[in-house]
Amino acid sequence: MAGAESPTECQAELEPVVSLVDVLEEDEELENEACAVLGGSDSEKCSYSQGSVGRQALYACSTCTPEGEEPAGICLACSYECHGSHKLFELYTKRNFRCDCGNSKFKNLECKLFPDKSKVNSCNKYNDNFFGLYCVCKRPYPDPEDEVPDEMIQCVVCEDWFHGRHLGAIPPESGDFQEMVCQACMRRCSFLWAYAAQLAVTRISAEDDGLLPNATGMGDEDVSKPENGAPQDNGLKEDAPEHGRDSVNEVKAEQKNEPCSSSSSESDLQTVFKKENIKTEPQSSCRLQELQAKQFVKKDAATYWPLNWRSKLCTCQDCMKMYGELDVLFLTDECDTVLAYENKGKNDQATDRRDPLMDTLSSMNRVQQVELICEYNDLKTELKDYLKRFADEGTVVKREDIQQFFEEFQSKKRRRVDGLQYYCS
């Protein structure tokens, strides 16, 4: 029929057009993500000798420790060397963990990189992630039965991963938040609600009209009000003793994409606190107590926190004691954040990554450098023009096309060299 489009034309219209630039940009983005997650971890040496590492990339081996067995985690190097052909669960990063590879939890495997390990690592913490299950729904990721596109977000406290729709509070549309604290951890660390009224990206205030739906469809809220201007404990007695005696300097250096020079473990923070190596100010008010004196709302929902929110937490002696009792002293450590870990990885990779072109240039004299740069620019220009023809025509670039390009390029180069005439003065 006249005017009808052929099946090929229809298919061409339906298929998305991806340029070479798009492919290169996507490849670079994936490489940067990999560097961020893996760059801060050693890919050749087992991390066991470092003790409980402040933060590192971790994996769980479903082949060696399937569901029903004791959970175990392995470091990046062991995932390559000892479990290369096994089914692994990628756990992203976790804090204060010591590699389990080859210990008593692995019945038929000895670690190739560090075989002399203790039977168990009693300080390690495990959850359902080590069996490939995540969120309150306890489902795998990716979930073949879940057709709803949803982002998985990691809780900064328990380090479990959650679907955005199961957090009781919708993630900010802009994605402009650094960390999230899940519903269960907000219940356990209820002191954070006083900070949430001032710091959370989606602020929780007494003037909020609606209730945010939580994972079970409920939206409970508790408005805490001061009585006669006096500070209230707001149900925080179970979290910690009364606050507000000696306080420490709360002003911390803001983290602006610079990595922390070292990772402090939870045990390090405990040691610092126990030895009272904290500079105290003269008696002044506790920041948490000041916030609790104001009206704020507690909800059964997750909270989302901005960059550097941890530096705003009170670090007086009573608050530090409370953090220790709740096992969240890491919240006072800016180096504990995933962002700090990722930035360290990126910087380490940038330092280690050598540019072969720059290495070649540095080994040449000035004349050779100029000639090489000119040749490089010629190649770049001609290759761009050559590929543009395929883009304009909508045709696929084949291996033979690239071979033909370089043959023609070399031929042109030989003609230019052969055509040069040298004169002696």
UniProtKB/Swiss-Prot annotation:
Sequence segments annotated as region (Disordered): 212-269
UniProt cross-references to PROSITE patterns, sorted A to Z: ZF_UBR
Gene Ontology biological process terms in this record: protein ubiquitination
PHD-type ZnF: 132-188
Keywords of the record: Isopeptide bond, Metal-binding, Phosphoprotein, Transferase, Ubl conjugation, Ubl conjugation pathway, Zinc, Zinc-finger
Stored InterPro entries: UBR7 (IPR040204), UBR7-like_UBR-box (IPR047506), Znf_FYVE_PHD (IPR011011), Znf_RING/FYVE/PHD (IPR013083), Znf_UBR (IPR003126)
Tissue expression per record: Expressed in testis and sperm (at protein level).
UniProt modified residues of type Phosphoserine: S264
Compositionally biased region (Basic and acidic residues): 235-257
UniProt cross-references to Pfam families, sorted A to Z: zf-UBR
SUPFAM superfamilies attached to this UniProt entry: FYVE/PHD zinc finger (SSF57903)
EC number assigned by the record: 2.3.2.27
Molecular function GO terms recorded: ubiquitin protein ligase activity; zinc ion binding
Reactions performed catalytically: S-ubiquitinyl-[E2 ubiquitin-conjugating enzyme]-L-cysteine + [acceptor protein]-L-lysine = [E2 ubiquitin-conjugating enzyme]-L-cysteine + N(6)-ubiquitinyl-[acceptor protein]-L-lysine
Coiled coil residues, start to end: none
SMART domains documented for this protein: ZnF_UBR1 (SM00396)
Crosslink position(s): Glycyl lysine isopeptide (Lys-Gly) (interchain with G-Cter in SUMO2): K225, K252, K274, K398
Zinc finger (UBR-type): 44-116
Pathway terms, separated by semicolons: Protein modification; protein ubiquitination
Keyword Signal (UniProt): no
UniProt function note: E3 ubiquitin-protein ligase which is a component of the N-end rule pathway. Recognizes and binds to proteins bearing specific N-terminal residues that are destabilizing according to the N-end rule, leading to their ubiquitination and subsequent degradation.
Record-given protein name: Putative E3 ubiquitin-protein ligase UBR7
Originating species: Mus musculus
